[in-house]
């Protein structure tokens, strides 16, 4: 390990312990040349969880991206950040539980819409208008009509497994 201060290649480990989360090892090191101390972290290099986009591209699952989309949909709505975090947690668990370590964005979006439909119909419509990518006003009105016709907020489509 090179010293970040003088670039000397040799150091000694002064202290070593697990991080607070238990997912890494924190090591306190001292340079053998300049005697300055610095901290390093050692962790397992994990295979990332992936999402498959509509066009077939794959990218890493980004929890913050999901939360940002939900926050935009729920802006100025009475949906607590706690509920949004719970939805994001469920979406993340849904991706993590996949044996292939990937899920389609359509599956994740459907799961999120199911929750929004229960919590706040306006937020649901906002999210659906972006997620479902309506081609014209008729498609949008059709979705609104379906929403108005459902008396039971739990009456929503189920998530289909990846094939």
From Swiss-Prot:
Single GO MF descriptor: zinc ion binding
Sorted keywords for this record are: ATP-binding, DNA-binding, Metal-binding, Nucleotide-binding, Repressor, Transcription, Transcription regulation, Zinc, Zinc-finger
**Positions of the zinc fingers (unnamed)?**
3-34
Its Gene Ontology biological processes? negative regulation of DNA-templated transcription
Q: Which cofactor does it need?
A: Zn(2+)
- InterPro entries on file: ATP-cone_dom (IPR005144), NrdR-like_N (IPR055173), RNR_NrdR-like (IPR003796)
- Pfam families in alphabetical order: ATP-cone, Zn_ribbon_NrdR
The answer to keyword Nucleotide-binding applying to this record is: yes
Q: Which residues form the ATP-cone domain?
A: 49-139
- Nucleus found in the keyword field: no
Cofactor details (free text): Binds 1 zinc ion.
What's its job?
Negatively regulates transcription of bacterial ribonucleotide reductase nrd genes and operons by binding to NrdR-boxes.
Can you tell me which family this protein belongs to? Belongs to the NrdR family.
Q: What name does this protein carry?
A: Transcriptional repressor NrdR
